[in-house]
UniProtKB/Swiss-Prot annotation:
Subcellular location: Cytoplasm
GO molecular function, one term: single-stranded DNA binding
Family to which the UniProt record says this protein belongs: Belongs to the RecA family.
Listed name of the protein: Protein RecA
Region listing for Disordered, in residue ranges: 331-353
Gene Ontology annotations for the cellular component aspect, listed alphabetically: cytosol
Residues the record lists as binding ATP: G64, P65, E66, S67, S68, G69, K70, T71
A Pfam family hit: RecA
Basic and acidic residues: compositionally biased ranges: 335-346
Entry keyword set: ATP-binding, Cytoplasm, DNA damage, DNA recombination, DNA repair, DNA-binding, Nucleotide-binding, SOS response
Length: 353
């Protein structure tokens, strides 16, 4: 062994004594090089994300205009984590979470940890405490724009508080980023959009809370309504576009189109109809759809109703589509094979706190 290697080994041993085992290692020695994920609750979005779902131990931003479906997308992620036996927390800074709607989306509201903070500092401190515990699998903050700094709440209505929220988010994310990675928690921040004044060229839209969240996010999703869905004259939902505008774990800029039905969330049946026809699992002739050589209905909405009434056929088609797309296990398979993380790996060493 050369003198250089001996010197390096000595330095590494000293660092491990000071900061704990694993403080420095070769990248090739890591056992978690493959990105571990949780399904988003949508086959199309799982495919657009490139790795089969939301990456664990990463920060994710979901932003878009009002009533575009941002909270719905986040609640579906919570439902998937809970279905696999995970623990979820929701920081409701907007004080607007509808428990009945969350339940309709599949969220176990009896076991969802909820906080409605009085100000931004309190909300982010609670989020950090949840993450540092190592016992929470997913945490959602709704929304960044509603994380009002304490000084602004206690001040007068017309007072100027330039850059306070951006400073708050920057400080919080510096503390959160390492904890999120070590605890393998998925941290989802929902954000609104604002318009910059005086922009003549390019997109005038921006997100509140400064630039820090843009930098620290591994995945950024832009959610926008595309068109209304009707049954006769009644509007029953929206066709929604979800664009992956930033992705550190797969190629970005892919777009997922989903049906978000009022009171029910993302329509799994709608995705199965569209993707089934695209990947030729379902055969389409004019307005008629066939499966395994047998006609099952005419028109997209009628096929969605048929699949709702025949869950065995729906699940069978779902699995064939996932196999054709190369996207992870189906929802039922995922529930049966929850990956257990040893407690000693999840909890932080007291010496590091």
């Amino acid at each position: 062994m050369s003198e250089r290697q001996k010197a390096l080994d000595t330095v590494i041993k000293n660092m491990e004594k000071s900061f704990g085992k694993g403080a420095v290692m070769k990248l090739g020695d890591r056992t978690d090089r493959n990105v571990s994920t949780v399904s988003s609750g949508s086959i199309t979005l799982d495919s657009a994300l490139g790795v089969g779902g939301y990456p664990k131990g990463r920060i994710i931003e979901i932003y878009g205009p009002e009533s575009s479906g941002k909270t719905t997308v986040a609640l579906h992620a919570i439902a998937e984590v809970q279905r696999q036996g995970g623990v979820a927390a929701f920081i409701d800074a907007e004080h607007a979470l509808d428990p009945v709607y969350a339940k309709n989306l599949g969220v176990d509201i009896e076991n969802l940890y909820l906080s409605q903070p009085d100000h931004g500092e309190q909300g982010l401190e609670i989020a950090e405490a949840f993450v540092r515990s190592g016992a929470v699998d997913i945490i959602v903050v709704d929304s960044v724009a509603a994380l009002t700094p304490k000084a602004e709440i206690e001040g007068e209505m017309g007072d100027s508080h330039m850059g306070l929220q951006a400073r708050l988010m920057s400080q919080a994310l510096r503390k959160l980023s390492g904890s999120v990675s070590k605890s393998n928690t998925i941290a989802i921040f929902i954000n609104q959009v604002r318009e910059k004044i005086g922009v003549m060229f390019g997109n005038p839209e921006t997100t509140p809370g400064g630039r820090a969240l843009k930098f620290y996010s591994s995945v950024r999703l832009e959610v926008r309504r595309a068109e209304q869905l009707k049954q006769g004259q009644e509007i029953v939902g929206n066709r929604t576009k979800i664009k992956v505008v930033k992705n550190k774990v797969a190629p970005p800029f892919k777009v997922a189109e989903v049906d978000i039905m009022y009171g029910k969330g993302i329509s799994r049946e709608g995705e199965i109809v569209d993707l089934g026809a695209e990947y030729e699992v379902l055969q389409k002739s004019g307005a008629w759809y066939s499966y395994d050589g047998e006609r099952i209905g005419q028109g997209r909405e009628n096929i969605k109703t048929y699949l709702k009434e025949n869950p065995e056929v729906r699940d069978e088609i779902d699995q064939k589509i996932r196999k054709a797309m190369g996207v992870g296990a189906s929802l039922e398979e995922a529930s049966a094979q929850k990956e257990e993380v040893p407690v000693e790996d999840k909890l932080f060493d007291d010496e590091l706190e």
